[in-house]
From Swiss-Prot:
Pathway annotation: Secondary metabolite biosynthesis; flavonoid biosynthesis
Top enzyme category: transferase
Keyword terms of this UniProt record: Acyltransferase, Flavonoid biosynthesis, Transferase
Active site: C164
Protein name: Chalcone synthase
Described purpose of this protein according to its UniProt entry: The primary product of this enzyme is 4,2',4',6'-tetrahydroxychalcone (also termed naringenin-chalcone or chalcone) which can under specific conditions spontaneously isomerize into naringenin.
The protein's Enzyme Commission number: 2.3.1.74
Species this chain originates from: Vigna unguiculata
Signal peptide: none
């Protein structure tokens, strides 16, 4: 008779979970950050708020963002004027948009990842879908399964309302699934659309205005599996270690609340300080076992958040400017896409491999993927690059 331990042993993969393919997508509507304040105050009928507009202009100028992509166009906003007010009941209008567009944008990213993977979609065994943009039943995971034509018995996991740290959370979950289910191939999708948070300005809620200056739309997908098939699957990054923690004394630092007016956004001014204060301990727990204490010796995949956060983290750790360059490039080209950001960054690193590098980690062996968001919660993923 076979023992339980023998069954468990047979169920486990031999090697570490590995990212096998990456895909990203954005809506076609591209917004120029330099002209966005004029557009934003005009479309929300707020041009009379001249002092607040000047303040918003400064926010946009300091954001280090050049452009963002948004599903919500001027035409859509004219059809749904309640979304342009600061606090008008508008959840129905927002939900009508996101329950359709979140899975649709996720599909675009997933199709690209599956194509790069090169295997039939019938080999996908698990699906993880993550979004902070709306809630519905059946969820976006179900809708994506239908849109992609995945097998009806694919094992699905739906993650709603996680926020900006979730790009690390989904990889942590995918790692556990891949390593504990021999032969598993996990499709991971993060899809974010700002239709749920867009609203007009208010001089009493400046942190909401910060969100209007930073957030953009995007979807990202990865295929994760252990024991890549030689000559068929191309390993990109191994997921070696993961952790999540709540930063002490950080309650209320970043909050989002779903209301009749949509998803409201709140953050404290000291978010950059809280993140930089706690990142050292998180990195120490991750890299001390590897005898790594020089964080300039690893490659970085950091959630961009905003320029002030990146500046304080770099200063705290003594990072060279090039360590955060790719993160700043993603912020510049796309804005803050919440959970999707870190995968866009991974995709940029993968593309740079074609430029004569020896490993998928910019010629470095080890790397960190670092995310932070509501809670304030921190996600840490240790990555191991793969020889090209």
């Amino acid at each position: 008779m076979v023992s339980v331990s023998e069954i468990r042993q047979a169920q486990r993969a031999e090697g570490p979970a590995t990212i096998l393919a990456i895909g990203t997508a954005t809506p076609p509507n591209c917004v120029d950050q330099s002209t966005y304040p004029d557009y934003y105050f005009r479309i929300t009928n707020s041009e009379h708020m001249t002092d607040l507009k000047e303040k918003f202009q400064r926010m946009c100028d300091k954001s280090m963002i050049k452009k963002r992509y948004m599903h919500v166009t001027e035409e859509i906003l004219k059809e749904n004027p309640s979304m342009c007010a600061y606090m008008a009941p508008s959840l129905d209008a927002r939900q009508d948009i996101v329950v359709v567009e979140v899975p649709r944008l996720g599909k675009e990213a997933a199709v690209k990842a599956i194509k790069e993977w090169g295997q039939p979609k019938s080999k996908i065994t698990h699906l993880i879908f993550c979004t902070t943009s709306g809630v519905d039943m059946p969820g976006a995971d179900y809708q994506l399964t239908k849109l992609l034509g995945l097998r009806p018995y694919v094992k699905r996991y739906m993650m709603y309302q996680q926020g900006c740290f979730a790009g690390g959370t989904v990889l942590r979950l995918a790692k556990d699934l891949a390593e504990n289910n021999k032969g598993a191939r996990v499709l991971v999708v993060c899809s974010e659309i700002t239709a749920v948070t867009f609203r007009g300005p208010s001089d009493t809620h400046l942190d909401s205005l910060v969100g209007q200056a930073l957030f953009g739309d995007g979807a990202a997908a990865v295929i994760v599996g252990s024991d890549p098939i030689p000559q068929i699957e191309k390993p990109l990054f191994e997921l070696v270690w993961t952790a999540q923690t709540i930063a002490p004394d950080s309650e209320g630092a970043i909050d989002g609340h779903l209301r009749e007016v949509g998803l409201t956004f709140h953050l404290l001014k000291d978010v950059p300080g809280i993140v930089s204060k706690n990142i050292g301990k998180a990195l120490s727990e991750a890299f001390d076992p590897l005898n790594i204490s020089d964080y300039n010796s690893i490659f970085w995949i950091a959630h961009p958040g905003g320029p002030a956060i990146l500046d304080q983290v770099a200063q705290k750790l003594g990072l060279k400017p090039e360590k955060m360059k790719a993160t700043r490039d993603v912020l510049s080209d796309y804005g803050n896409m919440s959970s999707a950001c870190v995968t866009f960054h991974l995709d940029e690193i993968e593309k740079s491999v074609e430029n004569g590098l020896k490993t998928t980690g910019k010629d470095l062996e080890w790397g960190v993927l670092f995310g932070f968001g509501p809670g304030l919660s921190l996600e840490t993923v240790v990555l191991h690059s793969v020889a090209i």
